Amino acid sequence: MVQIYLPRLSMRLGYHDKNNKMTILLTGGRGKTASHIASLLQAAKVPFIVASRSSDPSSSSPYYQNCFDWLDEKTYGDVLTSKDSMQPISTIWLVPPPIFDLAPLMIKFVDFASRKGVKRFVLLSASTIKKGGPAMGQVHEYLASLGGIEYAVLRPTWFMENFSYPQELQRLAIKNENKIYSAAGDGKLPFVSVADIARVAFRTLTDEKSHNTDYVLLGPELITYDQVAETLSTVLGRTITHIKLTEEELVKRLENSGMPAEDAKMLAGMDTSISDGAEDRLNNVVKHVTGADPRTFLDFATHQKATWG
């Protein structure tokens, strides 16, 4: 197990464009992270727009919305147009599109947004993908190489919410079969909550001084899938069993759920890497950036109890 600890940041006062002369664009508006970030921005009275392929500007949502499709360059200009009396968009939360070769598209949009006056980008990546690596790693490297812009890259480990969001396979297996499935064996990992990712994102999006670095975001404890099953059993009052699959069996399970073959192989490979110790590490980054400890899996499961029926 690797433990990395950073000195706590002093809390920054104010936002990077003072007097709210900023509007933040949240891509991936229907995803796990954007909704949590939106709540934090709304509470802080920071103007923002939520964007996704299915966003409807005329909807009754409490948030301003705009349509954005990574694959449709015609939406790029519209999504960067601020609403009503809002200031121009100065900051973007970048959530990668669900495609294999995502870097060229994301880099093209970053360039387009930069020409339109966007000054800061915060990228959602993954704990196992380093700068210069595949997919988001290429975007990470590009952001770090640009002069004249501010950036941060968030690299969270596996989400706790993968067990609780409505259409997640793990949630359905818990609810309907009293089982969870993995190819991680007895490997340990520090599951992190989307709520904690959002708190770090809020700081990197709004702090007056840009972070200009990447953060590996981990939960507070190393646990196995067997321990996840034990915790769920305790919280739910019924036995939840961890079914240990081979990598090939997990690929087949994911493909049977409708996942494209390339994505299924990639995710199953990441799962197997857990058994080899790829996620066996802890740090204090969440507290370092936000000033508060990340939530435990027990706390998460207790609050999400109703979702598993």
Curated annotation (Swiss-Prot):
Its EC number is 1.5.1.46. It catalyses: agroclavine + NADP(+) = didehydroagroclavine + NADPH + H(+). GO terms for molecular function: oxidoreductase activity. Induction: Strongly expressed in planta but weakly expressed in axenic culture. Pathway: Alkaloid biosynthesis; ergot alkaloid biosynthesis. The keyword GTP-binding does not apply. Pfam families: NmrA. Coiled coil: none annotated. Keywords: Alkaloid metabolism, NADP, Oxidoreductase. Gene3D superfamilies: NAD(P)-binding Rossmann-like Domain, UDP-galactose 4-epimerase, domain 1. It comes from the Eukaryota. The keyword Cell inner membrane does not apply. GO terms for biological process: indole alkaloid biosynthetic process. It is an enzyme of class 1 (oxidoreductase). PANTHER family: PRESTALK A DIFFERENTIATION PROTEIN A, PTHR43162. NCBIfam families: ergot_EASG (TIGR03649). Agroclavine dehydrogenase; part of the gene cluster that mediates the biosynthesis of fungal ergot alkaloid ergovaline, the predominant ergopeptine product in E.festucae var. lolii. DmaW catalyzes the first step of ergot alkaloid biosynthesis by condensing dimethylallyl diphosphate (DMAP) and tryptophan to form 4-dimethylallyl-L-tryptophan. The second step is catalyzed by the methyltransferase easF that methylates 4-dimethylallyl-L-tryptophan in the presence of S-adenosyl-L-methionine, resulting in the formation of 4-dimethylallyl-L-abrine. Belongs to the fgaFS/easG family. Monomer. This is Agroclavine dehydrogenase. It comes from Epichloe festucae var. lolii (Neotyphodium lolii).
